[in-house]
């Protein structure tokens, strides 16, 4: 069955509380998807973000925790955990991270003081014990110390049992505050996901390849990463120099110690996927090529130039994962430098690959051209890392424009390019056709979500337009091209 969906991160939804959240507007958006005939909603990672990491959902202090800025304040009010006077409304514009981190934390502190059902927290802690105990303790110590885990005293840094016991007793209140925050987030998300299911909408989640060095994941499982005796990274992740960057990209995350992952039967990965399948129906695997071979750069290098390719045990990993999750919920983000080995890995396990129509018109044989897109692909109009179609077209070279017009059989005006490319994506054989919301709204570079390589100023775009006006237009197209549900 050929399906269609919208790519829109939760932070981009309208909301009076400074950032898109899990409140009324998220439910309204799901109603819109249902009324149009869509069956998929793709989001970016829901993990915690921070100002220090440029608010990137791909740079988090936990690959398991939820981002408290997405919590809906009105639900806290409905549960009598805060008062009406505690609600602050902000003008609808870009995501106000600087304000929202403080504001939502204050609200949650008040809500925690008024919370009485501690048996619910204990049940939640038990259910999520494989990550939450360590995460809540990590957050409590980090608050107390005011620095990252690798700067803590040796006994805490190295997780010595007695030291952890002592600090847990000392910081019990803060520990339970962070358990409470996660309890609220997961409760609100589960409620929203149930609503989506009732409307026949599946949610596509997104799994970043690596956690940050300054994360609970690395502190809790140092043996699963390539660290030295002082727990400093031996190598960090990135991508080599290419056409777009002479020095490559240096991400700075510690790389996996795959030998240890294999030794423990990939237990950490199984838990991670299992955890995320409680939240999502499908999982996009960011930087899929890293499962076949990854670029590692010696720690301390200023660019990615002096890195090297190292083989990863992708075949063994996916064999194991698919024995646990036979429905194969994965989508490979296989864009960029892709070798035959990466293709072979994806095809061996029948994992759908990603194609983007914006890449289609740079050469005649492109695998991104609609007639070359295969059934086992997810076809995008654009992605969070790319300009929306209108912005892309504005900067498109003469040769590529010519190819586009030849492909369409006529020249078209700038304001119509988004419609034409949406049609081409929908008409393809791809099992999933995903339209980025900015393309449905015909927005340009002002609405771009992320500029890779630019550390700050990203992830701020929010919907200001009345998107429901697009309902009849898109409903008709989904019907014409056999993707309406």
Curated annotation (Swiss-Prot):
Single biological process term from Gene Ontology: carbohydrate metabolic process
Cellular localisation: Cytoplasm
Entry keyword annotation includes Transcription regulation: no
Keywords, alphabetical: Carbohydrate metabolism, Cytoplasm, Glycosyltransferase, Transferase
Domain of life: Bacteria
InterPro entries per UniProt: Glyco_hydro_77, Glycoside_hydrolase_SF
Reaction(s) this enzyme catalyzes, per UniProt: Transfers a segment of a (1->4)-alpha-D-glucan to a new position in an acceptor, which may be glucose or a (1->4)-alpha-D-glucan
Pfam families per record: Glyco_hydro_77 (PF02446)
EC number: 2.4.1.25
An MF annotation (GO) of this entry: 4-alpha-glucanotransferase activity
GO cellular component: cytoplasm
Family: Belongs to the disproportionating enzyme family.
The name this protein goes by in its record: 4-alpha-glucanotransferase
């Amino acid at each position: 069955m050929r399906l269609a969906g919208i790519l829109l991160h939760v932070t981009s939804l309208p909301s009076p509380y400074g950032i898109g959240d899990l409140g009324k507007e998220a439910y309204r958006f799901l109603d819109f998807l249902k009324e149009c005939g869509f069956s998929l909603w793709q989001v970016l990672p829901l993990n915690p973000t921070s100002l220090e990491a440029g608010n990137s959902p791909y740079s988090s202090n936990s690959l398991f925790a939820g981002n408290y800025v997405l919590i809906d304040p009105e639900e806290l009010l409905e549960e009598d955990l805060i008062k009406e006077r505690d609600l602050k409304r902000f003008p609808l514009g870009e995501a106000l991270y600087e304000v929202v981190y403080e504001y939502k934390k204050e609200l949650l502190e008040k809500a925690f003081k008024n919370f009485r059902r501690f048996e619910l927290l204990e049940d939640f802690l038990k259910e999520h014990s494989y990550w939450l105990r360590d995460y809540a303790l990590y957050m409590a110590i980090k608050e107390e110390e005011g620095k990252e885990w690798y700067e803590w005293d040796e006994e805490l840094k190295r997780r010595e049992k007695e030291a952890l016991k002592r600090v847990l007793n000392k910081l019990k209140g803060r520990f339970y505050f962070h358990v409470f925050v996660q309890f609220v987030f997961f409760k609100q998300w589960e409620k929203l996901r149930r609503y989506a299911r009732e409307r026949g909408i599946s949610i596509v989640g997104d799994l970043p390849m690596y956690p940050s060095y300054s994360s609970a994941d690395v502190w809790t499982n140092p043996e699963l990463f390539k660290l030295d005796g002082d727990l400093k990274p031996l190598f960090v992740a990135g991508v080599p120099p290419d056409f777009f960057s002479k020095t490559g990209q240096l991400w700075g995350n510690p790389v996996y110690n795959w030998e240890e992952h294999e030794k423990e039967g990939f237990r950490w990965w199984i838990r991670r996927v299992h955890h995320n399948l409680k939240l999502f129906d499908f999982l996009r695997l960011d930087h899929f090529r890293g499962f076949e071979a990854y670029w590692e750069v010696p720690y301390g290098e200023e660019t990615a130039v002096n890195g090297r390719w190292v083989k990863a045990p992708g075949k063994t990993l996916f064999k194991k994962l698919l024995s646990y999750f036979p429905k194969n919920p994965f989508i490979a983000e296989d864009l960029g430098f892709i070798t035959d080995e990466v293709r072979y890995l994806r095809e061996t396990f029948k994992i759908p690959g990603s194609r983007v129509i914006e890449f289609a018109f740079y050469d005649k044989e492109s695998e991104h051209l609609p007639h070359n897109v295969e059934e086992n692909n997810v076809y995008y109009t654009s992605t969070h890392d790319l300009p929306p179609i209108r912005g892309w077209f504005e900067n498109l070279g003469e040769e590529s424009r010519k190819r586009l017009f030849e492909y369409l059989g006529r020249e078209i005006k700038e304001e119509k390019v988004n419609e034409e490319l949406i049609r081409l994506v929908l008409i393809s054989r791809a099992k999933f056709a995903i339209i980025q919301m900015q393309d449905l709204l015909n927005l340009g570079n002002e609405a771009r979500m992320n500029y890779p390589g630019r550390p700050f100023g990203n992830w701020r775009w929010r919907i200001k337009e009345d998107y429901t006006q697009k309902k009849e237009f898109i409903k008709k197209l989904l019907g014409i091209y056999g993707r309406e549900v």
